[in-house]
Amino acid sequence: PIETLAESSTYLESAFALVYGDLPNASQLMEWERAIARHSALPVQVVHAIEALPHDAHPMAVMLAGLNSLSSMHPEQNPAIAGGGIYNSHAVQDKQIVRIIGKMTTLAAHAYHRNTGRAPAAPNTRMSYAENFLYMLDAGLDNRHRPHPKLAKAMDVMFLLHAEHEMNCSTAACRHLASSGVDVFCAVAGAVGALYGPLHGGANEAVLKMLERIGNVENIPNFLAGVKEKRYVMFGFGHRVYKNFDPRAKIIRKIANDVFELVGRDPLIDVAIELEKQARADEYFVKRKLYPNVDFYSGLVYRAMGFPPEFFTVLFAIPRATGYLSHWRESLNDPDQKIMRPQQVYQGEWLRDYVPITSRSRSLTDAMEDIQPSNAARRRMAGDPSDAHPWFGNGMEMSTPAWQSGTTVGDATSGVENCLVKNVAAGK
């Protein structure tokens, strides 16, 4: 049960079980943790690629750039280069898995510090996975820094709870990409790209904004009434799988209390607890089986630990990479696996005749919207000597340069011609 894993296991131990099907023994766990730690550093070329991004780049965009850059670093294990059978080797599969798990926290640390303008601390391979992640965020140049054990434990359990949750949008994207034979970095990057979407990975941030809008417990009855009247949306409740209480939500609520004991109580936790209490006592929500899910309390935990809301999805992507890799490995070893090709039901027009362009009228159904250039683009085009500028039809006209007017071409170019003649005569 997930409650037992959260209490007794660790993220990496549970990750081993996800990938290989069973919990490891002591020697297997030690080798697994060491292999992941050995692959935690990023190639310098990937670091340079990240450093070339804008300082205000979204952390998930930085994660995607890093993963895609890693795709170019190991051509000898890329099916498109080394041959389609390269992943038939379990040893090759396993090496790619530990590479990505090891590098996810390092990529995340670089994504975090892209906004701060500082470089993260180098990975500390003597620390646990979650402890090393916090170390890279906070140590700076102080290699004696040690994250607080309670915060490291909270981070580890949060990773464990988010590692995998059956088939979903991003996991399906990973398996879909893997079926074409792409390298594993592209498959995981595609999945992380799907997670970037606010309908998938941004639910805990939406919960936080909802609680902030409610403000205090006195406003909860009015909010719940608005939800029933379709005036408000209640985030963090309900799940496609769990029709009763999401067990992960109970665990995260306990983690929240542990974190608050250390860093101080977030006043929004009282709003969250009372909202949960009133919703669970309301027949409207009970009848619809709307109970708190994993996202309801996780944003409060992340905020209490000092993470900005735009970083929440990165904290989701780090552990979920293990789930993606488990599905990737499973699909590779499935003898019946073929390239995925979903069927589509076409509902458009059937056979039509080709109409010459001079006889066509403007489409009345669907057409490209007018794309207005920026003022900077208009400035550049105003100095462009080309004849046709379709964007200048909106009240803007370009004066014709003298050298384009036809009657003054000779005059306009005579100075250039004379200069060329003099240079040739002088041997230049």
Task: Specify the residue positions occupied by each region the protein language model found.
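Non-transmembrane, aqueous-exposed alpha-helical and coiled segments at domain scale
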Residues: 1-395, 403, 419
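N-terminal low-complexity segments that are often proline-rich with Ser/Thr-Pro
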Residues: 394-427
